């Protein structure tokens, strides 16, 4: 997983390398995770469909909608960065 961003509430966002699904299509997983007193709040999306693969914890519907917006708007960039082996910062 490659790091993307860390939000003020402690949510960290990471994304995977490019993988192939059962139909031989290129996919990427984008994972949002926030530490809690009892573990983690987690949501994982699959690109390019932006469908939720996994959800656990106490993220609100508003937070999940925001995360979905992030992955939808960032879709081309996530693929570019995954091909590069992560985000390159000079």
Region locations from a protein language model:
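Generic detection of intrinsically disordered/low-complexity segments and helix-coil linkers/edges
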Residues: 1, 9, 26, 53, ...
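Acidic, low-complexity intrinsically disordered segments
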Residues: 55-90
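Alpha-helical interaction segments
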Residues: 5, 49, 68-70
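A short, structured beta-strand/loop element
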Residues: 15-59
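Negatively charged, low-complexity tracts enriched in Asp/Glu with abundant Ser/Thr
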Residues: 1-18
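A general, composition-driven signal for non-globular sequence regions
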Residues: 11-14, 38, 62, 77
């Amino acid at each position: 997983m490659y790091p993307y961003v860390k939000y003020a509430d402690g949510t960290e966002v990471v994304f995977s390398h490019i993988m192939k699904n059962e139909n031989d299509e290129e996919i990427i997983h984008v994972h949002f995770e926030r530490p809690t007193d009892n573990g983690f709040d987690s949501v994982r999306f699959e690109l390019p469909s932006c469908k939720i693969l996994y959800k656990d914890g106490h993220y609100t519907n508003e937070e999940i909608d925001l995360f979905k917006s992030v992955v939808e708007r960032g879709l081309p960039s996530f693929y570019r960065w995954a091909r590069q082996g992560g985000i390159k910062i000079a």
